[in-house]
Design a protein with these regions (language model features):
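Active-site-proximal, structured, solvent-exposed surfaces of multi-pass membrane proteins
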Residues: 1-186
Length: 186
């Protein structure tokens, strides 16, 4: 997991145009810009019928899935090893984290409305993810204190770029750099 704050190269930010990409293509493009030699998420076979989708996992991997727009509000994952997981508010559209599965595992995703929801499944390439992570982890903020109203930390910037924070853009937060209040870009 990346720290709360990390530096990102401006060239990467400028080159990462994801406006015409879906969420998986955008992540793969970012991983490539961060040095990955292969896609971070690779499509794997899946089949969708009314009421459920099935993924037959061929290789050990973390599995994710996207789906077409739907009015279905909840889905349930059932894995052949007995694990289950519920997803709510899926009508909002997000990537489903189906967890780590070994080769030979069958994943079924059932929906509450007995509708056909077309699923596209992906396997995570750990080498590509690690390469991207290591690039982002080169310059990170060390948090020195935090509370529900204040976060304090330091970062020694060795290469110019943009400081990225994993903090929600909620009213009331102020950003200070070297003691000077600065307007954040969101």
């Amino acid at each position: 997991v990346l720290p709360l704050g990390f530096m990102m190269d401006e060239d990467v930010i400028d080159a990462w145009d994801y406006s015409d990409l879906d969420e998986i293509e955008a992540q793969n493009r970012l991983a490539e810009l961060l040095g990955a030699d292969e896609p971070m998420l690779t499509e794997i076979p899946s089949e969708s019928v009314v009421g459920e989708s099935t993924i037959d996992v061929q290789e050990d991997a973390y599995i994710f899935a996207t789906y077409e727009s739907t009015t279905v509000d909840s889905m349930t994952e059932e894995i052949s090893d007995g694990r289950t997981k519920s997803f709510t508010k899926v009508s909002h559209g997000y990537t489903l984290d189906l967890g780590y599965c070994t080769a030979g595992t069958q994943v079924r995703i059932k929906n509450s409305n007995e509708e056909r929801v077309n699923i596209t499944a992906y396997a995570l390439n750990l080498d590509a993810a690690d390469t991207a992570y290591q690039t982002l982890n080169e310059q990170t903020m060390e948090m020195t204190s935090f509370s529900d109203t204040k976060i304090t930390g330091t970062i020694d910037v060795k290469k110019e770029g943009r400081l990225i924070f994993a903090v929600a853009d909620d009213a009331g937060w102020k950003l200070y750099v070297d003691g000077e209040q600065t307007d954040p870009e969101v």
